[in-house]
Amino acid sequence: MLMPKRVKHRKVQRGRMKGRATRGNFLAYGDFGLQATTCGWITSNQIEAARIAINRYIKRGGKLWIKIFPDKPVTEKPAETRMGSGKGSPEYWVAVVKPDRVVFELSGVTEDVAREAMRLASHKLPVRTKFVTRRDFEEMGGEK
């Protein structure tokens, strides 16, 4: 499971997800990618499940990059606890994902294999996604 080794603040506020992603919104390493089209929190367990789904399908036939990292702690109070008495303890970690953020990148496989692997991974994620290729970004205006 992905989580930070150490953090400056143990508990953080929930925050808002406004606007689109301004960083991580293009393919930096691979030839194919999975791009989020809606916003949401992706937990470390969901990232791991999607990673396993991709690796099982490509069978060591390519390289996978995970472009998000769960660095936000989510707190929960124990069950049947009365209101008040402070904020709960950190239970799991999430990555905040905005629209246009590239979540996974893949190279070393054909487009058909990459498309199916990303489709399997998208079923594990709580955000809507789309399959993108390097060609898509070159047509849009050559972002890197």
UniProtKB/Swiss-Prot annotation:
Part of the 50S ribosomal subunit. The keyword RNA-binding applies. Gene3D superfamilies: Ribosomal protein L10e/L16 (3.90.1170.10). The keyword rRNA-binding applies. One of its GO terms (biological process) is translation. One of its GO terms (molecular function) is rRNA binding. This is Large ribosomal subunit protein uL16. InterPro entries: Ribosomal_uL16, Ribosomal_uL16_bact-type, Ribosomal_uL16_CS, Ribosomal_uL16_dom, Ribosomal_uL16_sf. It comes from Clostridium botulinum (strain Eklund 17B / Type B). Signal peptide: none annotated.
